[in-house]
């Protein structure tokens, strides 16, 4: 199945249990083979293609919570040192996805972390072990240290997610953050973003999650993410992801279930 415009707002860890994945961004492509764990940096977007390679669930994943990342940074920090320019050098898209040298221990740790099977203190060190098995642990450390802070756009995303049924305007964001509209616009421009695209990304991200994780009808989902017209929601969804909500639902839910 192929999907466009996948946006990640958190670090995501994925295990390609019964599939291979092709990630595309511009002219760059990342291939993740079957039965591999990989870590995706937050605030990236890409197109994705999944190809089944066995029976059962295609892949499993979980988001890394901000608190866990902050603790992970404290654990890693004493053991790594980088020149100042390491944090300012532009990294390619490929350098924002970290493949983990997978073995039975790594896969077991992935499952424990996904299922919250360990106390928080233990989970931090389990995650640190997982990271140490990355193909390029130093590059992951640079990623972590560079992005652990909450950006301005992330603060807006959190605000938008708090009530997607609201008809958000730039003036609403300015009022909530106690700054001017011009300041909001300029600070988003510094991150190469604009408000209209950001709110579209957030609405479509949440719509996809509702389709995957709930039994809501398309009309209900449209309303929950701020659309009064179901037909306009369907049109927007198709333009954004490259498939209609119904085809997305059929494809995703069939692929996530056991292949019969």
Curated annotation (Swiss-Prot):
Residue stretches making up the HTH araC/xylS-type domain: 154-251
DNA-binding residue intervals: 171-192, 218-241
Molecular function in Gene Ontology: DNA-binding transcription factor activity; transcription cis-regulatory region binding
GO cellular component, one term: cytosol
Coiled coil: none
Record Gene3D superfamilies: Homeodomain-like
SUPFAM superfamilies tied to this protein: Homeodomain-like
Keywords: Activator, DNA-binding, Transcription, Transcription regulation
Keyword DNA-binding: yes
Domain of life: Bacteria
Any Pfam family: HTH_18
Purpose: Positive regulator of the expression of the 987P operon for the fimbrial protein in enterotoxigenic E.coli.
Subunit structure of this chain's protein: Homodimer.
UniProt name for this protein: HTH-type transcriptional activator FapR
Native species: Escherichia coli
